[in-house]
């Protein structure tokens, strides 16, 4: 199942007023992939639905405790929007340990600020988010996009975007090519003298 194609098909159903068809398709794709974009569209499939309705709708496809991080983050986002801080915290609890990703840490900061107003704890989570591993995203040729695109804007390659954890840059400057191969004591080659006889 190709997630971007399924999302496009579901949006077409929604725009035609065929919400049931869209939700059926999204449920099937969610079970197969667990992709966060599918959960987000499923939650927003009914135009005009309240935040509480969106949270309830996600509860139809995601059980507690969430089976994986993407499910927990989707539930937490919907719960934060509905001001249901307890549900948001429960959804992220299995993923908010020492290996929390940037997305989980950012959501935890929102929960701390929204539920308790504790700026110190919120800043602590934001500081963790800066150092945390990145979440998967649509990437192509080193570019990160919020959503899948059919063509890479960098190279023009068709179907270049992949759902994966973006490559992080090393803080260390790489050595220029060829430098590592020379021993430290080796004399540098000199150019031949122009007037050598």
Show which residues each predicted segment covers.
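Long, internal scaffold/assembly segments composed of regular secondary structure
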Residues: 1-24
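Start-of-helix register in tetratricopeptide repeats
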Residues: 3-4, 37, 70, 103-104
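"A position-specific structural signal for the A-helix of alpha-solenoid helical repeats
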Residues: 7-8, 41, 74, 105-111
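TPR/TPR-like alpha-solenoid repeats
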Residues: 12, 45, 78, 111, ...
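TPR/TPR-like (Sel1-like) alpha-helical repeat modules
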Residues: 17-37, 96-102, 113-137
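Alpha-helical adaptor scaffolds
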Residues: 24-98
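Juxtamembrane/interface motifs at transmembrane-helix termini
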Residues: 26, 44, 109-110, 141-146
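Intrinsically disordered, low-complexity, charge-biased linker/tail regions
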Residues: 36-41, 52-74, 123-197
């Amino acid at each position: 199942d190709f997630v971007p194609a399924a999302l496009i098909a579901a949006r077409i159903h929604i725009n035609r007023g065929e919400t049931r068809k869209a939700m059926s398709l999204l449920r099937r794709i969610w079970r197969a992939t667990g992709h966060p974009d599918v959960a987000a569209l499923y939650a927003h499939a009914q135009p005009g639905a309240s935040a509480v309705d969106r949270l309830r709708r996600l509860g139809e496809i995601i059980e507690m405790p969430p089976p994986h991080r993407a499910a927990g983050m989707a539930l937490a986002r919907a719960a934060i929007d509905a001001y249901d801080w307890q549900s948001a915290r429960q959804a992220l609890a299995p993923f908010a340990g020492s290996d929390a990703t940037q997305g989980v840490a950012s959501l935890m900061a929102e929960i701390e600020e929204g539920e308790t107003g504790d700026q110190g704890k919120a800043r602590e989570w934001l500081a963790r988010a800066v150092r945390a591993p990145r979440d998967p995203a649509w990437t192509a040729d080193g570019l990160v996009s919020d959503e899948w695109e059919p063509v890479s804007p960098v190279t023009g390659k068709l179907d270049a975007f992949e759902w994966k954890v973006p490559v992080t840059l090393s803080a260390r400057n790489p050595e220029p090519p060829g430098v590592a191969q020379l021993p430290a004591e080796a004399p540098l080659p000199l150019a031949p003298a122009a007037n050598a006889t």
